[in-house]
Design a protein with these regions (language model features):
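Glycine-enriched loop-and-adjacent helix/strand subsegments that border the catalytic/binding cleft
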Residues: 74-187
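N-terminal non-catalytic cap/leader segment that marks the start of a structured domain
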Residues: 1-107, 112-113, 129
Length: 187
């Protein structure tokens, strides 16, 4: 997504070698618009990508400092802690026991999704004592997944697989969770 100063940016298609891009405006204007109309735009976007990578389109030079995250904001951010060893270590670091059920029933929380950082922007923190921690994670973007969808059927709902940097303020987490209402400031 090209950071054009708007809240949702402008969808672009980047070449596989990360050297060139074209705007997708003739098909859709934003990544969210692409998700909302996936069945009708997926093939069109794929065709543009094929032509771009074959050198058949007039393109612009890609500069990673000019892009935003694919979704500058989104409707939902649900983070599942599927790496149980990591959950165990993080809980141990803050003096919390890990329930046995986490081995079979993964921990999940709903995080903020109203303002994601661009990939090349600095992460500014007013006070380092808050304990900034960054985790490389895998993000799965889906279409609509109705309640009761089977695991097998859920696979067909996957639209994108992305890498994401999840930022936590580890030293704020214990006091925040002690309030019994979950993450707000620390994630």
């Amino acid at each position: 997504t090209l950071n054009d100063g708007t809240k949702d940016g402008q969808l672009i298609i980047v070449s596989k070698d990360l050297k060139t891009f074209v705007k997708a405006q003739d098909v859709v204007t934003t990544m969210q618009n692409a998700m909302d109309n996936w069945d009708s735009v997926k093939t069109l976007l794929e065709d543009i990508s094929i032509e771009l990578n074959a050198g058949k389109l007039k393109s612009n030079t890609f500069d990673a400092t000019l892009v935003h995250s694919p979704f500058p904001r989104s409707f939902q951010w649900a983070d599942g802690s599927a790496y149980v060893n990591h959950v165990h270590l993080v809980r141990k670091a803050r003096g919390a026991e890990m329930p046995e059920s986490f081995w079979t029933d993964p921990l999940m929380y709903q995080g903020g999704s109203d303002d994601f950082y661009p990939p090349m922007s600095p992460i500014l923190l007013p006070d380092e004592s808050w304990g900034i921690d960054m985790e490389g994670e895998i993000a799965i973007v889906t279409g609509e997944v109705k309640m009761g969808t089977t695991s097998e059927d859920a696979l067909s709902k996957i639209r994108l697989i992305m890498l994401v940097n999840d930022v936590s303020l580890r030293n704020l987490i214990p006091n925040e969770l002690a309030k019994g209402f979950g993450f707000f400031q620390s994630k």
